[in-house]
Design a protein with these regions (language model features):
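Conserved alpha/beta core of the MobA/IspD/sugar-nucleotide pyrophosphorylase nucleotidyltransferase superfamily
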Residues: 48-120
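Conserved core of the sugar-phosphate nucleotidyltransferase
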Residues: 1-69
C-alpha cells in the first residue's frame, strides 16, 4: 500500500480538515513509511506532513484491506489509514512537491469554483 505526502503549510497545521501524516523516512523527504495519521489541531509535531489522499495498492493488499473491519483507531480518528496500520500493514510514502487541488470542504468547493470562473 502506498500514499503521498507533501509539505504542511503553516495555515494547514491547525486545520482539522487537513490530514497530517508522520513518516519514518528511509531516504529523507523522498521515500518513507507512515506511522501516524491525525487531523487534530491539538497535536503538533515538528515532522508532520500534509497527507495527499491518493493511494496505490497491490491486488492482494487491496483484498486484505477491504476484508478488514474498521479498527478502534479508525473509528476514533475517522481516518481509514488506521485500519491498515492497526492490521500491521505497511504504508509506503513518497514525497511530492506539488499537490493537486482537492475538494474536501465547502470552502474548497468555493475556491475551485472561483478558479474556474477566473479562467473562463
Amino acid at each position: 500500500m502506498g500514499t503521498l505526502a507533501t509539505e504542511l503549510k503553516n495555515n494547514q497545521k491547525n486545520d482539522p480538515s487537513v490530514t497530517k501524516i508522520r513518516i519514518d523516512w528511509i531516504k529523507k523527504n523522498t521515500i518513507g513509511q507512515a506511522f501516524d495519521f491525525f487531523k487534530s489541531s491539538k497535536v503538533t509535531y515538528d515532522e508532520a506532513y500534509h497527507h495527499v489522499g491518493i493511494y496505490s495498492f497491490r491486488y492482494e493488499t487491496l483484498k486484505k484491506f477491504t476484508s478488514l473491519t474498521p479498527s478502534i483507531n479508525e473509528l476514533e480518528h475517522k481516518l481509514e489509514q488506521w485500519r491498515a496500520l492497526d492490521a500491521r500493514m505497511t504504508i509506503g510514502v513518497n514525497y511530492v512537491k506539488d499537490v493537486p487541488i482537492s475538494v474536501d470542504t465547502k470552502k474548497d468547493l468555493i475556491n475551485v469554483e472561483n478558479i474556474i470562473k477566473n479562467k473562463l
